[in-house]
């Protein structure tokens, strides 16, 4: 049976007072991505006809953050409740489509659950997403009669008997566009909060003889919202634990799944070993037999087979070839590319530079805007001086070059194959193939030198 076309409304107008932040609540991140972006990405998996986003507080920030998303922006100038928010969007509803109502601060909702909910919607009726809570305090209670939902009563309006009910409303629902428009036009704000409750349409549907069905979410956390940083942290931990469990079951070795964060997507081969406190951000791809030491951060990186990344190294937009060794305490900045079997050691920074196969930069060096050939050795303290305060220049180093300790290479400069540069040199001119270059102040010996003494 063909599914009725549907559109989505995401409510994202709230300020989030309890966040104590200038950032709109829905822009606070889970796993490095805003809560509302999680919801949008979930909806985009479902082939929705249109996504309406109801905004209010921090609208300019929201529009900047979501400028590339296919959204219809709907302004809610005053925040007068969920029903009022839906009223602002109702003018865009087609009568013959279903409308799925979601919240921008419930980031872990799944496409599978939402698909079940849409499939459960009765003709001309409503399907609600509910959940059972051990402590339902603060949530709207589901009132049933003969199995069907007849009302949702908010905490402040509930009777003592109704307060004992543990099945609660998640706020997520689906109905036809025609039904929503009809019921939304009848809402009033005669309640303790003086707001327009979307939940009042449940009673309207029942009065007209239309069925209201409830579908329960698979887990509480997928429908849990975040109104403060404590709840936000709980969602983050649940999300990270879920990601860690998926990786463990897929063969990835995590030394401690409670001390691992995935803030993006990960592609991986076999026999991956990840130590504690590793953070993977953006799009990360790991080959086979990759080892990542404790405390490393990788963002938007491609890592080949048999790579050993030692502890406390930080990489961003870098490519690392097979059998390379990096770290500890190494930094690869955007544009760094290490070929196979290369070594980058402790306290080395590589930026917008290509390190050739088998080359080594093992200690306390900076290589920026550079091309380094194969089987080179750059000693401790080597610096490519690539910036004159206004412009950047390139250093080119051929194959089989040896650069001694504490050498400054003043770009632009070319070092040909087989060259050797003595320690302490400052190189300002090109060096020919197989040349030895020494540039240092002659050593002086002063006999009988007396050191200064402190005055008493």
Swiss-Prot record:
Binding positions for Mg(2+) per the UniProt entry: 105, 227
Region: N-acetyltransferase, residue numbers: 251-456
Region (Pyrophosphorylase) residue spans: 1-229
Pathway involvement of the protein, from the record: Nucleotide-sugar biosynthesis; UDP-N-acetyl-alpha-D-glucosamine biosynthesis; N-acetyl-alpha-D-glucosamine 1-phosphate from alpha-D-glucosamine 6-phosphate (route II): step 2/2; Nucleotide-sugar biosynthesis; UDP-N-acetyl-alpha-D-glucosamine biosynthesis; UDP-N-acetyl-alpha-D-glucosamine from N-acetyl-alpha-D-glucosamine 1-phosphate: step 1/1; Bacterial outer membrane biogenesis; LPS lipid A biosynthesis
InterPro entries noted in UniProt: Bifunctional_GlmU (IPR005882), GlmU-like (IPR050065), GlmU_C_LbH (IPR038009), Hexapep (IPR001451), Hexapep_transf_CS (IPR018357), MobA-like_NTP_Trfase (IPR025877), Nucleotide-diphossugar_trans (IPR029044), Trimer_LpxA-like_sf (IPR011004)
Note on cofactor: Binds 1 Mg(2+) ion per subunit.
Major location (coarse): cytoplasm
Positions with a binding annotation for UDP-N-acetyl-alpha-D-glucosamine: 11-14, 25, 76, 81-82, 103-105, 140, 154, 169, 227, 333, 351, 366, 377
Positions with a binding annotation for acetyl-CoA: 380, 386-387, 405, 423, 440
Region (Linker): 230-250
Matching Gene3D superfamilies: Hexapeptide repeat proteins, Spore Coat Polysaccharide Biosynthesis Protein SpsA, Chain A
Keywords: Acyltransferase, Cell shape, Cell wall biogenesis/degradation, Cytoplasm, Magnesium, Metal-binding, Multifunctional enzyme, Nucleotidyltransferase, Peptidoglycan synthesis, Repeat, Transferase
Reaction catalysis annotation: alpha-D-glucosamine 1-phosphate + acetyl-CoA = N-acetyl-alpha-D-glucosamine 1-phosphate + CoA + H(+); N-acetyl-alpha-D-glucosamine 1-phosphate + UTP + H(+) = UDP-N-acetyl-alpha-D-glucosamine + diphosphate
UniProt cofactor(s): Mg(2+)
GO annotation terms (biological process): cell morphogenesis; cell wall organization; lipid A biosynthetic process; peptidoglycan biosynthetic process; regulation of cell shape; UDP-N-acetylglucosamine biosynthetic process
Record keyword Transit peptide present: no
Keyword check for Transferase: yes
EC number: 2.7.7.23, 2.3.1.157
Active site feature: 363
HAMAP family: GlmU (MF_01631)
Self-association state and partner proteins as the record states: Homotrimer.
NCBIfam families: glmU, PRK09451.1
Protein known as: Bifunctional protein GlmU
Species in which this protein is naturally found: Haemophilus ducreyi (strain 35000HP / ATCC 700724)
């Amino acid at each position: 049976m063909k599914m009725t076309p549907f559109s989505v409304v995401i409510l994202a107008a709230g300020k989030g007072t309890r966040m104590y932040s200038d950032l709109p609540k829905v822009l606070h991140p889970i796993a490095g991505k805003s809560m509302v972006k999680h919801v949008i990405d979930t909806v985009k998996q479902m082939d929705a006809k249109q996504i309406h986003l109801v905004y209010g507080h921090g609208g300019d920030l929201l529009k900047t953050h979501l400028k590339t998303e296919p959204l219809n922006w709907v302004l809610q100038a005053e925040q007068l409740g969920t029903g009022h928010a839906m009223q602002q969007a109702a003018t865009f509803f087609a009568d013959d489509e279903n409308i799925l109502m979601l919240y921008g601060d419930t980031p872990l909702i799944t496409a599978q659950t939402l698909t079940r909910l849409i499939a459960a919607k009765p003709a001309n009726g409503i399907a609600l997403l509910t959940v059972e809570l051990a402590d339902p305090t603060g949530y709207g209670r589901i009132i049933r009669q003969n199995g069907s939902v007849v009302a949702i009563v908010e905490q402040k309006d509930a009777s003592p008997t109704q307060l004992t009910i543990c099945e609660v409303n998640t706020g997520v629902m689906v109905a036809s566009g025609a039904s929503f428009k009809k019921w939304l036009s009848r809402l009033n704000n005669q309640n303790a909060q003086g707001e327009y409750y979307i939940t009042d349409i449940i009673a309207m549907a029942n009065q007209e003889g239309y069925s209201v069905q409830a579908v329960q979410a698979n887990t509480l956390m997928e429908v849990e919202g975040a109104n403060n940083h404590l709840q936000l942290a709980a969602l983050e931990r649940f999300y990270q634990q879920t990601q860690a469990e998926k990786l463990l079951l897929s063969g990835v070795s995590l030394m401690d799944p409670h001390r691992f964060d995935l803030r993006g997507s990960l592609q991986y081969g076999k026999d991956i070993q990840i130590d504690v406190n590793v953070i993977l951000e953006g799009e990360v791809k790991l080959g086979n037999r990759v080892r990542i030491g404790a405390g490393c951060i990788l963002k938007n990186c491609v890592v080949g087979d048999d790579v050993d990344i030692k502890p406390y190294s930080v990489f961003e937009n870098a490519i690392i070839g097979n059998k390379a060794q990096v770290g500890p305490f190494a930094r690869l900045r955007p544009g760094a590319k290490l070929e196979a079997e290369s070594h980058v050691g402790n306290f080395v920074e590589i930026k917008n530079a290509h390190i050739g196969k088998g080359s080594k930069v093992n200690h306390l060096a900076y290589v920026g805007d550079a091309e380094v050939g194969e089987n080179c050795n750059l000693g401790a303290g080597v610096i490519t001086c690539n910036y004159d305060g206004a412009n950047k220049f390139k250093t080119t180093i051929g194959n089989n070059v040896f650069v001694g300790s504490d050498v400054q290479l003043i770009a632009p400069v070319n070092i040909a194959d087989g060259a050797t540069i003595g320690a302490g040199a400052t190189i300002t001119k090109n060096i020919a193939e197989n040349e030895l270059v020494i540039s240092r102040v002659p050593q002086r010996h002063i006999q009988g030198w007396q050191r200064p003494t402190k005055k008493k």
